[in-house]
Structure formats: structure tokens, C-alpha cells
């Protein structure tokens, strides 16, 4: 007798084969049989009129913090995702020494666009090692979790805050390799690294200070275990992206490890990039490199506010200077006619960062207080047309 039988559903097995009516039997945590005439189950579910299919695996998430208070990884589970892979882009919440919690929290919130109020309300730091982090979230999990360990966290754990300023010494490189081994022993699926992330102070994240020699030493450990490496390349520039592919191909071949790049997406700001990247991946695959790119399947949207510097304005020095001056100074600058005109003009001429196709006119107000609360849901373009001013001035108001 099976533990569970899902009967009479439209079975899509995930292979691309034609969907057929049938049943699926489960024993313990594994599928035991798929077919039309299966034996009885201790529990049976009538799936008539429904689809029985494998859950999606989401290979690029940042649920590291959310899983500490939401074991279902809402809303992913609601959309058919049954396995998440957090810890991408060199960022995880472990291993982490207590004295570095404030730094990591600020950096994590900046990069993942998380409100400090939500982060602080939900997160209770009770761990230092990767295993302790895993143990703290395991009882709450209602979704399969296969986390990577972040290269930046390994460096922060071994080098401390010096990891933000320099490469590792030979002794530190060996300690980093030992730390990675421990994390893999404690449940990490693999490792992630980044060549482009910046922290809350707009400085490179720690892994960007690593040498290729350090990365090679860590890939040696991944090769010992047959574990993957996730890489965040300079995805907005085809030349830089292809250079990273060539570098990572050497590591993949040398250590016989799979390496995945994310994200890869098409944008009007960088025509032809996807084709060049896929051609370079194919060329390196022919040499024996195990490389895959994760293609973005939906538009990227961004949420930002004016309480501090953010990625949207990172290519606009005038805006960055004002936003980093503090709330009072920002309000004063926004009220000055000359500054308003200069900032508005800058939004018309500055290149967008990260190959974003960004339009102030189409930007919508999602939250506001006071008089502006009545404008929530409307675009800056609509409001600018009504007031006869530049959309950037609406934003400043």
C-alpha cells in the first residue's frame, strides 16, 4: 500500500512528453509509481480536473532572511515552486560572527530592497555557523530549501571587515577553503560569488576584493565535492560578460564543476547581448566546460524611495550627492529652484545603470504620506502633465 495516491489527474511529468490522464503514488518523500491502475493508498486525493506535475525549482532566490519567519517562501509556493535556492550573488546570512550582523543586515537590505522595519521585525539572529542557521529555519520549512553559501560571507567570517578592503593572504585563503568545506558539510549546496554587487555604502561587496587565485582555491573545494558555483557577472556589458564566461570556463574544466551565470536578459539597452553570450557558452561547452546561463523570464521591476542613495540613480552624480546628504539636506535641495532644474536635467541625459530601460514618466507612486497619499497608484508622467512640470520635479515634491 502506498502512503499517498493522487488519482485521475492530467499527469505532466516534466520531460516534455504528452500529458496523459493517470495517477501518481508516493511513499515517504519520493514518487513510487506513475500510471493508470495503481494500488491503494493510505491517503488518496481525487485529482480529477486537475494537473499533477512536478513543482518548479527556482534556482535564483534571496529568501535567506524571509525563511527565518516564513517557511513557505511566500508567494513562491503559491505559484507552484516547491524548491528554492537562496544564497545567490555571494550573499547569505551565514557563516556570520555576531559583530558583523549590523554590517551584513544593512548590505543585505540594500541589495535585496528589503525595508529595515520588516527585516528587523522578522529576523532573530541566533546563529554563527552555516549549520546553526540551517537548524534555526528547518523546523519552519514547508518548502524544499537548497541554499548556497555566499563567497562574501566566507570572506567576512575569515577576514572580518578587512574583507571589504583587500585580497586574502595565503593563510587566509586556506582558512577560506576550510570554512567552505565546513559549510558544505553543514548543508550548503554550493557557493555563489559576484563581480558587480555593491553594499549599502556603495562599496564593492567583499567577494569582489578576491583574487582569481582565491576563487580557484575555493573551486578546488567545490570540485572535491562535485558542487556548483553561481556567478553574478557584469550582465549589462557583453564584452565583460563574455570575459567572465572564459574565466569561469577555465575553472569549470580544471575542477570539473558546474557553473551557472545569472541573470541573462534581453534589453533594448543592450541589443545582441544574449546571442553573444549563448555563442560564447556553446564555444566553451565544446571544450568541456559545464556552463549554464539562467535566462530572465519576466521584466525586472525595481522599488525605490528617496530616503537614501539607491541603484536607480547610481549613474547620476548630482542625485547621488543629494540623496546621500541626509533627509534634511535632501529636502532643502529639492526645494531649491536651481537644484531642481539641475537634477531634472540630469535624469534626461544620464545613462541608466545595469542596462535598465527606465522611464520616470512611467514610474508609479506605490506609497506616500500626507497630501501625496491621494496620488498613490498614479504615474509621475500623469502628475507632471497636470502640473506642467518635469516628472523629476513631481518626484522631488
Each language-model region and where it sits:
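Short coil/turn connectors at secondary-structure junctions
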Residues: 1-2, 39-42, 48, 52-54, ...
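Histidine-rich, glycine-flanked metal-binding segment
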Residues: 2-4, 11-55, 70
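Divalent metal-coordination and catalytic microenvironments
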Residues: 9, 24, 29, 49, ...
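Di-metal (Zn2+ and/or Mg2+/Mn2+) metal-binding site signature of metallo-dependent hydrolases
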Residues: 51-75
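Active-site neighborhood of phospho(di)ester-bond hydrolases with catalytic His/Asp-centered motifs
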Residues: 53-60, 85-88, 232, 262
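Acidic, glycine-rich active-site loops and adjacent beta-strand->loop/helix elements
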Residues: 62-65, 89-92, 235, 265-267
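Divalent-metal coordination cores built from histidine and acidic residues
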Residues: 69-190, 222-224
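Active-site neighborhoods of metal-dependent hydrolases
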Residues: 133, 137, 141-142, 148-161, ...
Amino acid at each position: 500500500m502506498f502512503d499517498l495516491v493522487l488519482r485521475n489527474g492530467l499527469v505532466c511529468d516534466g520531460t516534455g512528453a504528452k500529458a496523459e490522464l493517470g495517477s501518481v503514488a508516493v511513499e515517504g518523500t519520493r514518487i513510487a509509481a506513475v500510471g493508470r491502475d495503481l494500488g491503494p493508498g493510505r491517503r488518496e486525493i481525487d485529482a480529477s480536473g486537475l494537473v499533477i506535475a512536478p513543482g518548479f525549482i527556482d534556482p535564483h532566490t534571496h529568501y535567506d532572511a524571509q525563511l527565518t519567519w516564513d517557511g513557505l517562501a511566500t508567494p513562491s509556493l503559491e505559484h507552484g515552486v516547491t524548491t528554492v535556492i537562496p544564497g545567490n550573488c555571494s550573499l547569505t546570512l551565514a557563516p556570520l560572527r555576531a559583530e558583523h550582523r549590523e554590517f551584513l543586515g544593512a548590505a543585505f537590505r540594500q541589495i535585496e530592497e528589503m525595508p529595515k522595519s520588516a527585516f528587523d521585525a522578522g529576523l532573530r539572529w541566533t546563529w554563527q555557523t552555516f549549520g546553526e542557521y540551517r537548524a534555526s529555519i528547518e523546523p519552519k520549512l514547508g518548502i524544499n530549501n537548497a541554499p548556497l553559501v555566499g563567497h562574501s560571507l566566507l570572506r567576512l567570517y575569515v577576514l572580518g571587515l578587512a574583507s571589504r578592503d583587500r585580497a586574502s593572504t595565503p593563510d587566509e585563503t586556506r582558512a577560506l577553503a576550510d570554512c567552505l568545506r565546513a559549510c558544505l558539510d553543514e548543508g550548503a549546496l554550493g557557493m555563489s560569488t559576484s563581480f558587480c554587487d555593491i553594499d549599502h555604502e556603495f562599496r564593492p561587496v567583499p567577494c569582489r576584493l578576491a583574487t582569481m587565485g582565491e576563487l580557484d582555491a575555493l573551486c578546488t573545494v567545490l570540485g572535491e565535492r562535485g558542487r556548483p558555483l553561481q556567478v553574478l557577472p557584469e550582465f549589462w556589458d557583453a564584452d565583460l560578460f563574455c570575459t567572465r564566461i572564459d574565466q569561469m570556463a577555465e575553472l569549470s574544466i580544471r575542477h570539473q564543476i558546474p557553473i551557472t551565470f545569472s541573470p541573462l536578459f534581453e534589453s533594448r539597452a543592450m541589443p545582441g547581448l544574449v546571442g553573444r553570450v549563448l555563442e560564447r557558452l556553446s564555444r566553451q561547452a565544446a571544450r568541456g566546460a559545464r556552463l549554464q546561463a539562467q535566462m530572465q523570464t519576466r521584466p525586472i521591476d525595481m522599488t525605490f524611495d528617496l530616503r537614501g542613495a539607491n541603484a536607480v540613480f547610481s549613474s547620476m552624480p548630482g542625485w547621488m550627492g543629494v540623496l546621500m546628504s541626509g533627509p534634511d539636506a535632501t529636502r532643502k535641495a529639492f526645494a531649491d529652484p536651481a537644484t531642481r532644474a539641475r537634477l531634472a536635467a540630469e535624469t534626461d541625459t544620464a545613462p541608466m545603470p545595469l542596462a535598465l530601460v527606465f522611464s520616470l514618466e512611467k514610474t508609479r507612486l506605490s506609497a506616500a504620506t500626507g497630501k501625496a497619499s491621494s496620488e498613490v497608484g498614479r504615474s509621475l508622467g500623469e502628475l507632471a502633465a497636470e502640473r506642467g512640470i518635469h516628472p523629476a520635479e513631481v518626484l522631488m515634491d
